[in-house]
Every structure is written in structure tokens, then in C-alpha cells.
Amino acid sequence: MSRQTEQQEEVLVNCAKCTRRVCDTKEWAEGPDNCPAKIRAEVISEATERCVSPENLGFAYNASKQEASCYIRLPHAPNVVSPSKSRVEEIMEFAERMGYRRLGVAFCVGVQYEASLLVPILENRGFEVVSVCCKCGSVPKEKLGFEEWEKISPGKFEPMCHPLAQAAILNSYNTELNIMVCLCVGHDSAFLKNSEAPCTVLAAKDRVFGHAPLLALYQSRSYHRRVLAKHTEPDAYKETERAKTESSRAKAKRRPPRGSHR
């Protein structure tokens, strides 16, 4: 069977488009034909067995306890559950439930101020904190094969973001839970891949929306409609990138050497 035929026959799970949400009830059998409870039941069963294994049970139990503790019932609305804790509070509580004492904070150098606010909060709660920024080591981007025109600011020294170094440093301190604060897309993935300790995200980087990426979705039907634009031409993105590259190269050639005067 060809790869194309396999792709045509494969039924994809797509919970995001489900209109029934039966998984939040006992009536899972009423789900759509591509419900994971129907077409991936064996996968779910195996995952559940791993979840309740001695290796994972404590983590899963405490995570669910943490979720349950984040709601209260107000006297004037006893039938409504209301959220009661910020994410910062939840992270600290979960770490306490797990018995963690040494936490790692991996942050983007662009949010060092925010990191400087976070660390004392964690320390005041009794945690020992190791924090490391993305530019640690000042390794030049040329190490990655960057040419001058590829930099954000050609003609200037630019250190690379170094999530592998961040993870390695925190690993060397045997941190028990690592908190990520605004690492770049891609760099966050590399950090997660290389961290030996479990990780959680306090904030995801979004340069346009003040590190609140869901705002792009909330405005996707109005001011941020460009994210819905379909790429009708397969190579449209490549052409755009090629044009940007040529423009950057031209600017880099015209720019006088650093320190020179016109």
C-alpha cells in the first residue's frame, strides 16, 4: 500500500472540531466517528496503564489534586465553581505537593525583569531556585553557521539563544521542576527535549501580544485575520522569505563597517 493511499484511509482524531464533548460525561460512546475513544481505544487503555504505574501515579494524582483545588464555591452561587488561584500560585502548590525543593527557571533575556520578580516569590515560599537566561555563555550566532545578513542587527555581535545550555546547567544542579518563561518558539522545544527534570510553562513568548498568545486566536476573526489566510501558492512562503533574504543581504552590503564614519 502506498504512502498516499495510507494517508487517504487514515482517520484523524480532531477533538477541536467536536460539537458533542461527550468525553466530559459517561456517554463517550455517543461521540463522533473519529472520537479517540472509538478509534484509539487501545492507545488510551495503554496510556491509562502507564498513568497508574508506580512511576507515574504520584505525578498524575497530584496534578489532578492541583486541578481540583483551584476552584471554590461562593456562598451566593453554590452551584457554580469559580477559579481561585493564579498560575504562579498553582506552580508553587504543585511543587509542594510533589515534595520538590529545588526549582529551575529558564527564561528569555528579554523578560529578565519578570524573572527577577518571579525568583523572590519562589524563594519566599521556601524553594531553592536556579535561574538561567537564554543568552548564557554569549555564544555567537556564527557558531550555528549564521552569515552577517541573517542576524537581527547585521554588523553587531549577536549571541545565540542557547536552550541546550540552559537545560544542561539546570541538569547539573539537579533541579526537580523547571519553569519556562518566554523561551522562543523552537528554543522552548529544544529545552523540553533536553531537560532531565519535568517542566512547566509560566508564560509563552508572543512578541506581538505581550506574551499572551491566545489573543491571536481571540482576534483571528477581526484585527488579526491574517492568521486565517490560506496559502494558495505552495511556494508563497518560500518566495516571501527569499525576498526578505535578498533585501537583508543588500542592506548588509550597503551598511558601513561598525565604527566607521560617513
Could you describe each region identified by the protein language model?
Residues 1-262:
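An N-terminal assembly and electron-transfer interface module characteristic of large anaerobic redox
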